[in-house]
Amino acid sequence: MKVSLSWLKDYIDIRMDAADLADALTMAGLEVESVSNRYAYLQTVVVGRVMEVRPHPNADKLTICRVDTGDRSDTVVCGAPNVSEGMLAPLAMPGTVFPDGSQLDQSVIRGEKSEGMLCSDVELGLGTDSSGIMALDSSLNVGDRLAQALGLEDTVFEFDLTPNRPDCLSVIGIAREIAAIQNTALKYPDYSLADKKNTISSLTSVRIEAPDHCPRYTARLVENIVLKPAPFWMQDRLLSVGLRPINNIVDITNYVLMETGQPLHAFDFDQLTQNRIVVKTAADGDKFVTLDQKERPLNHQMLMICDGEKPVAVGGVMGGLNSEIEDTSRRVLIESAYFNPVSIRKTSKTLGLATDASHRFERGVDPEGTVRAVNRAAKLMVELGEGTLIEGIIDEYPQPQTINRVSLSVERTHRLLGIHPDGNQIKGLLESIEFKVEKMIPEGEDQRLIVVPPSFRVDISRPEDLMEEVARLAGYNNIPTTFPAMPAEARPPARYLDLRNRLKGLMTGAGFTEAITYSFVAEAS
């Protein structure tokens, strides 16, 4: 998973440089696979001024431009319709490697030499507009490197997370770990929405017929939306983590997914028959066309999100072609649910279909995070999609999660870890990652802490899990090297083993060779 440093800084004040931060996170159990300068490829792209535009003698749709880069003038063949004399535009020099992996070389186009390339937003990975070259602000300095001129300096961390840490499959999840490392506060987005009445209940409903597969389903409705490109800052952040911008509504669901770790889905509300949602399993032999335009065979173990008469999504995996957001969509139903991880894993494997959503659902998302995520998405759709929020929220929760209390012995923690933090120090370490210590019980020399893990830590169920958290937060490098606490005693020789070894020695001495067969192979083989 990729996370950009600039995105992390929205939620926490980072006091370390990128290299030290990567080391600290790795030592805390979140392995940083790589640290890269996101805009390194722009070092060979400069701000150029188009000084002259003349027709290409051998091609009607091409022009030949003379571009000033401050200390030199380059001749560039250009096919963009918006190129004009006097404009500033990004000029890629020979040797530039673009985000799609292609490399620019000096070339001859229809008989005319081209010493560079005037670039569009999409070619530079800075947006989705491919209609013409990128027009730069006239106040920029000609000849400056584009990254520095636009302030595009960002570091991207790529993590190799273990399957037991789905809480870190989000920007906020990583920021939470940094907050614990630095002992600083985490700044959450505003998830609140002021609902004065429950208008949504008169427009739609949700019925869960398979609560074992879907313990919770939350939804909100936004109308009068206007589909358009998302603002540059959102597109830029999605691109930084490897997601392709599509439109403002779809981009918002992907943005909230990466921010919170909670997958969302946006339905065209007017394409839902009877304007309602039914969550149930499919029937053997059913078929369904997903968003990638492929027909998928279904079985009775697969969870489907349906409207009043038909399936509209494979629950937790991918939406359907029959309810996707289109240019004409005006009302959007936002889905935010908690699905059974085992169910999603089976469905994803059977269909051979892995998505960002299924990757998170099959590891376990926060069952208490559905409301926060759907509120966040609804607010962004009002702000960036010009939508009107329908007041009220649908929150079907037939199987609430039980509170998991774990008793942690301080004395046993000392014995197993080899470090000796007292009860209050252990309490502070656990509270730094939002664990709740309900009480501390003195029991003679052994003190116990009654700990409630946060709902997003689905991997915590026993005392040893808490000890692991104490160890990594205290620092694995602070655990002293000691001999194992086990008795070292000589055991009497086993007569059978002694006899077997003597026989083997006699047989090999007589010229025999020992054959060791594979395990679980029949004697006849």
Question: What is each PLM-predicted segment?
Answer:
Residues 173, 406-525:
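Extended, well-folded interaction surfaces typified by the phenylalanyl-tRNA synthetase beta subunit core
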Residues 5, 23, 63, 182, ...:
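Glycine/proline-enriched, intrinsically flexible loops and inter-domain linkers
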Residues 107, 277-318, 322-325, 486-525:
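Class II aminoacyl-tRNA synthetase-like tRNA-binding/catalytic domains
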Residues 3-7, 154-162, 215-223, 356-363, ...:
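Short, hydrophobic beta-strand segments
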Residues 1-198, 333, 350-352, 356, ...:
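Phosphate-backbone binding interfaces of nucleic-acid-interacting proteins
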Residues 178-209, 385-413, 417-420, 466:
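Terminal amphipathic helices with adjacent charged low-complexity linkers/tails
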Residues 122-123, 129, 227, 296, ...:
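Conserved catalytic alpha/beta cores of large enzymes that bind or transform nucleotide phosphates
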Residues 33, 49-77, 235-236, 253-322:
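Conserved mixed alpha/beta core segments that line enzyme active sites in large multi-domain catalysts
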